[in-house]
Structure formats: structure tokens, C-alpha cells
UniProtKB/Swiss-Prot annotation:
Residues 106-219 are lumenal. Homodimer. Heterodimer with PEX11G. Probably interacts with COPB2 and COPA. Interacts with PEX19. Interacts with FIS1. May be involved in peroxisomal proliferation and may regulate peroxisomes division. May mediate binding of coatomer proteins to the peroxisomal membrane. Promotes membrane protrusion and elongation on the peroxisomal surface. Residues 1-83, 240-247 are cytoplasmic. The keyword Translocase does not apply. This is Peroxisomal membrane protein 11A. Residues 220-239 are annotated as: Required for homodimerization, interaction with PEX11G, and peroxisomal localization. Keywords: Membrane, Peroxisome, Peroxisome biogenesis, Transmembrane, Transmembrane helix.
Length: 247
């Protein structure tokens, strides 16, 4: 309960709850739309989704500052690959939030001359770049974890006193995929923050992929991905130790 109270008291926490609500509405709307007798429910879900989306804009007005702070932190990373990926990802996120703020100002009627479609496409593009770079960082961290697990497994296999049932070497020719997936599973299992960050970024990237026409998805897939991503974000805000740290 204390963790939940701390969570709701944070701006990021409230934004994650609003985001989860928004994508839940999108997913439910997609599931209910084919049925003709659900028109009223679908309309209510659509209005709630729109209202929650607008409410989230107020929580995100300070995100440009947060993204700049994240850029400063990523520059100090000791490992070269995370430093480059996170710095560029944060810079792209700054541009994305600027575009998002311009779109929000336009929606209030203060800048009606702004080309909505152009700015929306710019926002989607820089959001995509940010997530893509974050995923590259995640994959790099996963590869390091897999190397460590493989090293530990090799040490276990050399020791006759250790139980190697879960770490048997798969036949290189016939079971290489099974061995790789098992190695990936153990790597993510021993590093939950990396698992959450990878899942979150993968689910998030579905939206800009659809908006940019790179990979088209339906609202149900985007809604489900957004909901899963929001739950992962809620966990990292409520339990900071589950957030992937910059080395």
C-alpha cells in the first residue's frame, strides 16, 4: 500500500496510470467494435480514451527537462555502446517531446496555423528513433548477460560436483536454437530490470512503426502493446530497483 501511495504521488506514476487506462480503452474498443449492440459502450470508451490522452499532455509538459537530464546522465556512462545509444536516444526524445508540446498547443487553439500532420509525423519519427536506439542498448546488454550465463554454465560443466541438468550443452547441429533460447531465458531471468526495459521498448515501438507506415498494426495490437508497456512502466516507477540502471 505504501508503494502504491508513493507511486500515485509521483507525476510519472499518474502518467503511467493514465497511459494504462488510455490503451486499455483502445484495446477494449477494438474488441467490442465488431458487435453492433456495443455502440454506446464503444463511444464511451472512445471519449474516455480521448479525455485521458488529453490529461496526459499536462503531465508530459516537463518531459523535455527530464529528457535533457537523462542526456546528461547517459553521457557519463562508462561503457561506450550504452553511452552512445542512450545519449542519442535521449536527444531524439527531447525533439519528440518538443513536437508533442507543439501539437498540444495547437489542440488548445493557441497555434491553429501549425501543420498538425507534419508535426505528428515528426513526433512519430523521433519517437521511433529514440525507441530503436534504446532497443539497441537493450540487445547489447542482453548479449553481455548471455555471455556471462554461458561462462557460468561452462564453469558448472567443468565441475563434476555441480548439477548440470539445466545447463546441458545442446547438440550444435540439431538443437542450436533451443540452446540459444534457453540461454536467452536464463539471461533475462537473472536480470529482471533488463527484461522489463526490453519488453517496454519493444511494445512501445509498435505505435510509431504503424504511424510511419513501416509496419502496420491494428488498434488491438497497439492497445495491447501499450497496456503491457504501461504495466512495465508502472512497475519501474513503483519499484525503482526494477529500473534498468546506466552503467
Amino acid at each position: 500500500m505504501d508503494a502504491f501511495i508513493r507511486f500515485t504521488n509521483q507525476t510519472q506514476g499518474r502518467d503511467r496510470l493514465f497511459r494504462a487506462t488510455q490503451y486499455t480503452c483502445m484495446l477494449l474498443r477494438y474488441l467490442l467494435e465488431p458487435k453492433a449492440d456495443n455502440e454506446k459502450v464503444v463511444m464511451k470508451l472512445k471519449k474516455l480514451e480521448s479525455s485521458v490522452s488529453t490529461g496526459r499532455k499536462w503531465f508530459r509538459l516537463g518531459n523535455v527537462v527530464h529528457a535533457l537530464q537523462a542526456t546528461q546522465q547517459s553521457v557519463r556512462a562508462t561503457d561506450l555502446v550504452p553511452r552512445i545509444c542512450l545519449t542519442l536516444a535521449s536527444l531524439n526524445r527531447v525533439i519528440y517531446f518538443i513536437c508533442d508540446t507543439v501539437l498540444f498547443v495547437r489542440s488548445t487553439g493557441l497555434a491553429s496555423g501549425v501543420n498538425k500532420e507534419k508535426w505528428r509525423r515528426w513526433a512519430a519519427r523521433y519517437y521511433y528513433y529514440s525507441l530503436l536506439l534504446s532497443l539497441v542498448r537493450d540487445l547489447y546488454e542482453v548479449s553481455l548477460q548471455m555471455k556471462q550465463v554461458a561462462h557460468d554454465r561452462a564453469k558448472r560443466e567443468k565441475s563434476p560436483s555441480q548439477d548440470t541438468l539445466g545447463y546441458s550443452v545442446a547438440d550444435e547441429e540439431t538443437e542450436w536454437l533451443q540452446s540459444l533460447l534457453l540461454l536467452l531465458f536464463h539471461s533475462l531471468k537473472r536480470h529482471p530490470p533488463l527484461f522489463l526495459d526490453t519488453v517496454k521498448n519493444f511494445c512501445d515501438i509498435l505505435n510509431p512503426l504503424d504511424q510511419l507506415g513501416i509496419y502496420k498494426s491494428n488498434p488491438g495490437i497497439i492497445g495491447l502493446g501499450g497496456l503491457v508497456s504501461s504495466v512495465a512502466g508502472i512497475i519501474t516507477v513503483a519499484y525503482p530497483q526494477m529500473k534498468l540502471k546506466t552503467q
